[in-house]
């Protein structure tokens, strides 16, 4: 055949012949199906077939004349309509039409059907190229059946080369309109409308973090994801440990999935139908299916990376056939947003003032922007939009892109992180908040708002134009240090971004943040559920509805938070401190009031190690242990280390370690390291007795200062006396460093002082501390200060030259591995 190529005959080098989409389908069918990646069969109508159609209808010069100049959105829309009307009025030449009919009959026979249902997709010759993202610009027709319907759909695909979005994008990218041609793919249609479909990215779409596979899934046909009509289920899988054979599903987030797009065969049209509440309340993919999709995604990424000779993150579409119950890959293309960004330099954003929160939703990106809100109900009113405004609408599709390019930020009432609005916002580098259900009614037209996506997974819309600061960070420009520079991290949703800062790992991962924001239930409210008051049981039931075993809710949810944070810094060490709430803070968790007795001074009361072995909390601590065990053993994240807080005596340390052993965590087994916070004078005075029990010490400067100076750090009246730089505190730190090193143990610090006082960080370096763990916003400036101090010491004492930022001993110490920020 002259104008037909079967997928099995084409590959990634055939983009000029069959376009990026079809070339990729052929590549996968030929090269990856033998490796177990299933791709539905089909054929491509070549770009030369499209040009044959244009010539046969004398359209080439007419189209070029219409598109010779385009000025503004309205002009592009008018000329787009004129060109598409010309194409749709054209006739497919008989020789081309017969080849298409014959190929369709052959495909139907191959699939055992008289007249096969097919998906018909446009595939531009400039599509899916690095730096060019035509995805969504051209037409796709689903559930097409019969020769006449196939021919009609092919003509509609031809016309879609001239949609307003496609014309505008070619203008922006500098592609001549006659230099880009179109191929059409005809592929076996899966019964996805009765099952599941979705998208896969082999990186985190918000940050570009490349060690994860992100999977979004919905019921029915996949157009609802792209159009942002529903909130999908979301899954993250860790690539490195998946390759090692583990099952590292880092997190699962249940989407709204309120609509299912189906094909109504009686009416020959696609309809959105409401999904029953019981289906919405469960994930649409099983864990085994998530892991299978992630493995296929790795195989696809590996293949394309080898083919291109460079790492190539991928944007993949999958579908589940409702008839066979099997998963298939239906598209794959190189990811273009993060691939187009070069170098390691990145910008950080932070609000410097606060305002009233008007609205919340899913944050897309890490930026902050302000502007007047423009609330637009539908695309017919796009002309009302003015450059620099904040677009507020239900959802967007490719028709909105001329407006999106002028927006300072985007807010949509529907959609998830892989919706059209989210994808384009990332591409344009503007903040977007999606899935903000009340956006259309909460934000008044013309009101000045600030859109912040710099505060974790939740995006906030504030009233007014709030002040914020930015900082450009180039890790390559920062000096190397002997002292390992780590970070204090609590929010797992910020971990992927924070891991891009120059660092040697996490010196303090705060479990209590995950307790409060992810788990939200007191552990004993789950182990002793039957003793709860009736109204509290209702609250607990709402949070644990998907879990038959309420204990499993706690373990699973806590493990997801820990795993996400730990995976972000893999393989650098992450030191997780077991829960260190005070009794009044535990009481604020759902169900907590039933298990916490009010204390006069919770700061010095029942906290830290003393809770872990006590009969009144031991069951809760064992759930913490079970979550950690799952992260290390099921997910394979063995870079996770542990830390015991507020351990008053060596005997308490032994008891806490014994309970950990009871729960299956044994120091030394599987490389497990356990550290202890040095925040009580007894930890310093008895350093020689604590050292045999633990792998290292972490100075908690906040509590240590409080207890050395006898100052309640929560008291306003004595607050001026609280100073980590006091000579007594400095002497305690120096004594601990000397004693720990003498015992063959390492010392770090994870308290607030080095972040607030650069001179205190310099003092610690002078004392020989092994690592300093800082708040993320202090990493860059403190790293520079530490390098200056080390250079001064080197000049004075002839210390060896810096060794860089890779994990390793800070200086010649005994056999124990150097602790990261502990």
Language-model features: locations:
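Conserved alpha/beta-domain cores
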Residues: 115-119, 124-134, 139-141, 179-183, ...
């Amino acid at each position: 055949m002259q104008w037909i190529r079967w997928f099995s005959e084409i590959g990634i080098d055939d983009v000029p012949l069959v376009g990026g989409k079809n070339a990729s389908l052929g590549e996968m069918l030929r090269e990856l199906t033998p490796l177990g990646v299933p791709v539905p069969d089909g054929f491509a109508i070549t770009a030369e077939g499209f040009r044959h159609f244009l010539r046969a209808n004398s359209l080439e010069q007419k189209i070029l004349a219409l598109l010779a100049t385009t000025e503004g959105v309205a002009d592009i829309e008018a000329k787009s309509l004129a060109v598409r009307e010309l194409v749709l009025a054209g006739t497919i030449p008989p020789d081309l039409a017969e080849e298409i009919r014959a190929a369709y009959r052959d495909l139907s026979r191959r699939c055992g059907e008289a007249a096969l249902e097919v998906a018909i997709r446009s595939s531009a010759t400039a599509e899916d190229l690095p730096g060019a993202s035509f995805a969504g610009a051209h037409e796709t027709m689903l559930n097409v059946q019969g020769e006449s319907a196939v021919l009609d759909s092919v003509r509609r695909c031809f016309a879609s080369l001239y949609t307003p979005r496609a014309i505008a994008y070619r203008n922006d990218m500098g592609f001549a309109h006659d230099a880009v041609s179109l191929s059409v793919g005809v592929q076996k249609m899966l019964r996805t409308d009765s099952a599941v479909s979705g998208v896969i990215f082999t990186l985190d779409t918000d940050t570009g973090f490349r060690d994860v596979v992100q999977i979004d899934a919905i019921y029915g046909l996949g157009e609802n994801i792209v159009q942002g009509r529903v909130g999908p289920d979301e899954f993250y899988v860790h690539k490195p440990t998946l390759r090692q054979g583990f099952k590292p599903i880092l997190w699962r987030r249940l989407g709204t999935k309120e609509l299912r797009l189906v094909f109504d065969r009686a009416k020959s049209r696609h309809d959105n139908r409401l999904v029953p509440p019981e289906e919405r309340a469960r994930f649409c993919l099983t864990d085994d299916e998530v892991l299978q999709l992630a493995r296929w995604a790795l195989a696809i990424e590996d293949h394309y990376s080898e083919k291109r000779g460079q790492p190539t993150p991928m944007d993949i579409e999958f579908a589940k056939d409702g008839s066979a119950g099997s998963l298939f890959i239906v598209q794959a293309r190189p990811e273009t947003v993060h691939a187009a960004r070069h170098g390691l330099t990145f910008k950080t954003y932070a609000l410097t003032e606060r305002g009233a929160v008007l609205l919340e939703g899913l944050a897309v990106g890490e930026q902050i922007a302000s502007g007047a809100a423009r609330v637009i109900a539908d695309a017919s009113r796009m002309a009302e939009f003015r450059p620099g405004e904040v677009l507020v609408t239900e959802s967007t599709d490719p028709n909105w892109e001329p407006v999106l390019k002028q927006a300072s930020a985007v807010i949509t009432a529907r959609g998830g992180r892989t919706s059209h609005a989210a994808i384009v916002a990332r591409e344009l580098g503007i903040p977007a908040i999606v899935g903000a259900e009340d956006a259309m009614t909460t934000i008044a037209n013309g009101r000045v708002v600030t859109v912040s996506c710099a505060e974790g997974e939740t995006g906030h819309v504030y009233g007014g134009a709030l002040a914020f600061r930015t900082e450009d960070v180039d890790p390559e420009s920062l000096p190397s240090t002997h002292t390992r520079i780590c970070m204090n991290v609590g929010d797992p949703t910020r971990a992927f971004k924070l891991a891009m800062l120059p660092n040697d790992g996490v010196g303090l991962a705060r479990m209590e943040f995950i307790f409060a924001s992810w788990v939200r239930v007191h552990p004993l409210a789950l182990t002793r559920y039957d003793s709860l008051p009736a109204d509290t049981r209702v609250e607990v039931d709402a949070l644990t509805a998907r879990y038959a075993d309420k204990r499993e809710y706690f373990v699973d949810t806590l493990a997801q938070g820990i795993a996400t944070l730990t995976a972000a810094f893999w393989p650098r060490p992450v030191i997780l401190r077991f829960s260190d709430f005070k009794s009044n803070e535990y009481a604020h968790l759902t169900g907590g009031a039933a298990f916490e007795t009010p204390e006069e001074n919770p700061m010095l009361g029942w906290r830290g190690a003393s809770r872990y072995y006590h009969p009144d909390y031991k069951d809760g601590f064992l759930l913490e242990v079970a979550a950690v065990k799952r992260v290390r053993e099921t997910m394979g994240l063995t870079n996770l280390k542990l830390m015991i807080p507020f351990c008053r005596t060596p005997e308490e340390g032994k008891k806490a370690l014994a309970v950990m052993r009871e729960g299956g965590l044994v120091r030394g087994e599987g490389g497990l390291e356990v550290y202890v916070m040095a925040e009580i004078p007894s930890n310093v005075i008895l350093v020689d007795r604590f050292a045999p029990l633990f792998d290292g010490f972490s100075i908690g400067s906040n509590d240590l200062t409080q207890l050395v100076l006898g100052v309640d750090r929560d008291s306003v009246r004595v607050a001026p006396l609280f100073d980590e730089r006091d000579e007594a505190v400095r002497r305690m730190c120096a004594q601990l460093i000397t004693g720990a090193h003498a015992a063959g143990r390492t010392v770090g610090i994870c308290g607030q002082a080095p972040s607030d006082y650069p001179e205190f960080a310099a003092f610690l370096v002078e004392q020989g501390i092994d690592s300093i763990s800082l708040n993320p916003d202090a990493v860059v400036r403190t790293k520079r200060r530490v390098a200056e101090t080390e250079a001064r010491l080197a000049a004075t004492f002839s210390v060896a030259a810096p060794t860089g930022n890779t994990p390793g001993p800070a200086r010649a110490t005994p056999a124990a591995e150097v602790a990261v920020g502990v």
